Amino acid sequence: MKTLNEDIKTGNFKPVYLLYGEEAYLKKQYRDRITKAIFPDGDTVNYAYYEGKGINPGELIDLAETMPFFADRRLIVIENSGFFKNASPELADYIKTMPDTACFLFVENEADKRGKMYKAVKSKG
């Protein structure tokens, strides 16, 4: 969390973040702080929110490849996707090469630290 607080203060964001654990309040608080730091004026044109296990990884990749509209980056928040239990190889491979104009923020209850997604996120975020 120290690194995350530093990123929020400096405005130098990594391409991907993972917030996980049982503490729903803290996850929501950090999610909101990151969103506000990336979009200080409240503009949500470059903000996308996905929730649940039926998320299509290809759709996330397409959105991340889309250039942000009059902003430095696009924020894509993915909550409770299950990607860190049942990894999406396509998304895990993409995270390793994703552009600096996109930022994935994963908010999960659990994350398998042995999984491909966790390792990909750890290498980039």
Question: Positions of the model-derived regions?
Answer:
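Non-catalytic interfacial helical region
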Residues: 1-3, 10, 14-17, 24-28, ...
